[in-house]
Structures are given as structure tokens and as C-alpha cells.
Regions:
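A residue-level marker of the well-folded mature domains of exported/periplasmic proteins
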Residues: 7-11, 18, 28-322
Length: 322
């Protein structure tokens, strides 16, 4: 048999896998034990760590629920085999946050054919046959970043400046949508110039750093960097700092985790970030609704929020960080 790598560490994970007395939740037949399999794309990025943490915390409230999380190690092939294995185990609900859309669509369809309810989280697949999709609206977030950019560069109709956009993974819906929303707004401003051809930073800080290092060498005047997530924006900031040019450039990111994006905004390294909530806890709640025979929404959109100098400190305080 093939070896599988599952993560179930820490107290919360342990509690999540305990099967004790019937839960007081609405989770259908409380004498029945449910097994949810969650295929997570990676566990190295901080946003993913928070995602799993929230999910395990929610699952731990339900003693009759066992949550198994697999780590796709940021590779499509690994994630496909993780999902195959959940199908073989006949989990009650499959949750998946895919590396990319195209490569994971086939195996998601396979799970649906096997009559397993599928909840897709954050990054989408190329089918809408799943039971539910839960995530932020990345077009809306992109537009918010676009509006913020226009404001920073002089306001509607008068905005002027050179912009570098650093993409997340180009084969993912969040990157496409974050571009789309942003472009919808800034392309209306004739004074705003986009300097680079789309460049794939695969959501990674190091790639943001490298792409920005090249951009700094090619362009004498860069006014604003729009990173598709906070790590990319921060990588770009570090590159500008190493080139002694960070003070002339504004940096915008997305995610808004207190200990990363919000902290960078509070320190004045990023100008703003836009919250992209982790969908794990909601995924558990919807999965239990499915088990209870309740109807769930086909699309559940999580809200965003703009974080800049005006509210960063307050958010850190509320998170117990500053
Ligand atoms: C983490 C991450 C987040 C980003 C999301 C998009 O893996 O890169 O930073 O917002 O995925 O799917």
C-alpha cells in the first residue's frame, strides 16, 4: 500500500479525532461518527497554517467528527493522490483547497461521481458540480486594491504613476480574479501605466523578491507594487529596501493575517492589505449541515476588509499582538 502523509498534530487535532459521547451539535445523527477528509495544498505558507488551525478548532467542537488533513506539499500530483485516497476511504465529506484549477478538476469530479459531497475552499476547480464553494470574492478584493491604488496615485481621473503587479499562481482562480478586479479599475485611468507583463510568483515571498529585483533594474520610476498576497508584496518591499528605493514606492498586499500583513502595514512597510479570510471553519460547519440533510448554499462568499495605517494598530491590539 502507498504511504500517505496526513497531518494531525497538536492538541486540537487530537481532540478533533477523538470519538467520545454524542455531540450536542445539530450534526445529524449524533450517534454516528463522521469522517471528513481535507486535502490542503500546502502547509508551509502562513495563511495555510492559520487555515488548518481554524478548521481543527471548529472540528474539535464536534466529538463525533473526525477530520483528516492531508498535505499536498504544493504539488498537483501529490494532491491528486491524496484525494484519490480519500475517495478510497469513502470519507463522508471531501473538502479541498486545490493547488491549481485544471490539474485538480478531474479528481474532484471523480469524488462527485463516487457520491461524496465535495466542498471546495478558496481556490476553485473548473467545474461547478461540487456541493459548495467557500471563499473570498477575489474580484471584489482586486477592485478594492484598484480603488486604493487610484486614490494613492492622485484620485479618479487624475491618477498618475507606474505600477508593478506581481501575480500569485497564474493557474489559480484567485490570481486571475485579483488581476481582473484590479485591472477593471486601474485600466480606466490613462495616467496609470502597468510596467510588467504578467509574472507568476506562485504566491511566494522569494519569487516576489526576485521579480521585484529585476523590475527595479529595468525601471527608474516605480510608484506602486500590487502583490497578489502579502508575502509577495513583502518580498517586493525587501527587494526595494535592498536597492535603497523602498521609500519611493507604495506596496499593497492581500491576506491580512495579523502577525504578517497587518504587522507589516503597522510598521509602514506595506501601505495596505486586504483581508482574505481563511474558509476552514465555515467548511466544517457546511459539511456538518450536509450530514444533517440541510440545504447548503452553492457559493458562500466571505467578507473582506481594507487594512491600512488607520486601523492596523487597532486590529493588532484586538488580536493580542501589540
Ligand atoms: C496561501 C495563499 C494565500 C493566498 C491564497 C490564494 O497558499 O497563497 O496567501 O491568499 O493562497 O489561494
Amino acid at each position: 500500500m502507498k504511504r500517505r502523509t496526513f497531518i494531525q498534530t497538536g492538541a486540537a487535532a487530537f481532540a478533533a479525532s477523538l470519538i467520545v459521547k454524542p455531540s450536542s451539535s445539530r450534526a445529524a445523527d449524533t450517534n454516528k461518527q463522521y469522517v471528513f477528509g481535507f486535502s490542503q495544498v500546502t502547509t508551509v505558507e502562513p495563511w495555510r497554517v492559520e487555515f488548518n488551525k481554524q478548521m481543527l478548532k471548529e472540528a474539535a467542537k464536534h466529538p463525533n467528527l473526525k477530520l483528516i488533513i492531508s498535505d499536498g506539499q504544493d504539488q498537483t500530483a501529490k494532491q491528486v493522490s491524496d484525494v484519490e485516497s480519500f475517495i478510497q476511504q469513502a470519507v463522508d465529506v471531501l473538502l479541498i483547497s486545490p493547488k491549481e484549477s485544471a490539474g485538480l478538476t478531474g479528481v474532484v469530479l471523480k469524488a462527485i461521481d463516487a457520491k461524496i459531497p465535495v466542498i471546495v475552499l478558496d481556490r476553485n476547480v473548473n467545474t461547478d458540480k461540487y456541493t459548495s464553494f467557500i471563499g473570498g470574492d477575489n474580484v471584489v478584493i482586486g477592485r478594492a486594491a484598484g480603488d486604493y491604488t487610484v486614490k494613492l496615485l492622485g484620485g479618479s481621473g487624475a491618477a498618475k504613476g507606474n505600477v508593478v503587479e506581481l501575480w500569485g499562481g497564474m493557474g489559480t482562480a484567485p490570481a486571475q480574479d485579483r488581476h481582473k478586479g484590479f485591472d477593471e479599475v486601474v485600466s480606466k485611468e490613462s495616467g496609470i501605466k502597468s510596467l510588467l507583463k504578467p509574472i507568476d510568483c506562485d504566491w511566494k515571498q522569494q519569487k516576489g523578491y526576485d521579480a521585484m529585483t529585476t523590475a527595479l533594474k529595468s525601471f527608474d520610476k516605480i510608484d506602486l507594487v500590487y502583490g497578489h498576497n502579502d508575502p509577495i508584496a513583502y518580498g517586493a518591499y525587501l527587494a526595494a529596501k535592498d536597492a535603497g528605493r523602498e521609500k519611493e514606492i507604495k506596496f499593497l498586499g492581500i491576506d491580512g493575517l495579523p502577525d504578517l500583513g497587518v504587522t507589516w502595514v503597522a510598521r509602514g512597510e506595506l501601505t495596505a492589505t486586504f483581508v482574505y479570510p481563511t474558509p476552514g471553519a465555515e467548511g466544517i460547519r457546511q459539511g456538518l449541515k450536509i450530514m444533517a440533510g440541510e440545504k447548503v448554499e452553492h457559493n458562500i462568499t466571505l467578507p473582506t476588509q481594507t487594512i491600512d495605517k488607520s486601523n492596523a494598530e487597532q486590529i493588532l491590539k484586538e488580536a493580542g499582538i501589540s
